Amino acid sequence: PAGGPAMPPAGSPAKRRYVPAVGPRLAKLLFAVFGLFALLVVDSVYLLGVRGLEAATGQTYQNWFYLILFLLHLVLGALLLLPAVGFGCAHWWRARSRPNRRAVAVGYALFTAVLLLLASGVVLTRLEGILVVKDPAVRAIAWWVHVLVPVAVAWLFVLHRLAGKRIRWRVGRRWAVVAALFAGGLLVVQAQDPRRWNMSGPASGERYFLPSLARTSTGGFIPARVLDNNAYCAECHADTHKRWQKSAHRFSSFNNPPYLFSVRETRKVALERDGDLQAARFCAGCHDPVVFFSGRFDDPKFDDVNDPTAKAGLTCTACHAITHVNSPRGNSDYTIEEPQHYPFAFSGNKALAWVNRQLIKAKPEFHKKTFLKPLHRTPEFCGACHKVHLPQQLNGYKWLRGQNHYDSFLLSGVSGHGVAAFYYPEKAEANCNGCHMKPVPSTDFGAKYHDGKTLAIRDHLFPSANTAIAKLAGEPEWPEIVKEHERFNDGVVRVDLFGVKEGGTIDGPLTAPLRPRVPTLVPGRSYLL
């Protein structure tokens, strides 16, 4: 019609209505993504700074505050997940046909990098019931992706924005300064107090524990709930806990009938002779750590049948909280500490307990340093209890040697230190764990490839122990437990014969060495080997 808008010529393409790549609603979502990402940058600079400080100094600076900020990292990452993916999809849909193909291509690369960053974070978080990755190699790859991809994201974002509105560099610089000052200030403060491992406890605490040689890191007692916390450990280490339940370590305390009889008699005699139970402490440093370090052992009225701690045995924490072996004397000459747990470890609230588990699964390094120290891989650690002497305070007589597995191991050829080591075995075994804690297949958290093929954990049955304990303690599976010990002991005894003397006397004719010529022994005659 006259006066109306001009119509396009017939056959010409209709003009599309301009749709901005980032509209008003999408701009609000982008602002939320930027805000969350900015907070994550500040938090990440601090977390990486602590890791770098630890790598440079060899010290441990992670603590409760660090774990809280790591929890904040997980929360911010979870909050960023949907907005980032949602904005990326919407922005892609709006901008996919833009004529600036270079900006579109860089945008695709940027969105891919963001997805990689978020996916690696999900893999590392190991959400219960959703995605739990235990393979150490996969986690290592995911960690490096999570650390390096943010650099690519920042670079690609700058390239992508060069095709659009002018970048406000001033805002970025200000936020970088804030991140550096915040993280740097916290690092300076945190660097003043590294976590101290492998330290001997104060001598002042001996008065609570002598004649046992054990000490605590503070010189005081440790709450029973801290030491007797196996159910907490079993949540992530079920296979390890199952093997431990069948071990002699589980039945080390008043739940072991022969030990119960022995320690009752020792406590009775000590009380009658000395007026207190101090002499009986000699047993408790190795056999009754929960009762002992919580201060209950000295109670003459301690109920060794019905008190829950009496049946605790040698618990997970009782071994793994040991932080120092004070000397090779044995008799529990070690220092044990109250371990620093992740936040909410003892919470009765299910939600907070779940948060605690997620923190450990997502960031297990500090947990591992706390509960698995280098000393746990040494024969001196085992020797702290597998080497015994009877002190005068106990027997009222004199110092006497008791069972001593530690010295006999060192004097044997197996250790590589004994005189027989020059010919047997072909390869020495440097520590007790090499034989008594062989790897067993498992998918527990903490399992690793000992042979390069199968995930495995160290066996906490400790085969070769007393085979009678399981039956005496009433363990339903005792026949199978005994068989496992027997299988371990099959063929382990070796008797080396260097020569024989005829007549069975010391001055008889000697035939030696027995190789390569082997003498023929006559049945019925006597020989001295």
Where are these regions (language model features)?
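Compositionally biased, low-complexity flexible segments
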Residues: A2-P5
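Membrane-embedded alpha-helical bundles that constitute the cytochrome b-like, heme-associated redox core
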Residues: M7-P202
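Membrane-interface helix-loop-helix modules in multi-pass inner-membrane proteins
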Residues: L80-H91, R98-V132, P136-V145, L277-R281, ...
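Histidine-centered divalent metal-coordination motifs
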Residues: H73, H146, H160, C236-H237, ...
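Soluble catalytic regions of membrane-associated enzymes that act on cell-envelope
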Residues: L227, A231, E235-A238, W244
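Primarily the internal scaffold of c-type cytochrome electron-transfer domains
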Residues: D135, I167-V178, A191-A224, T240-G275, ...
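Conserved helix-loop functional segments at active or binding sites
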Residues: R51, F292, P391
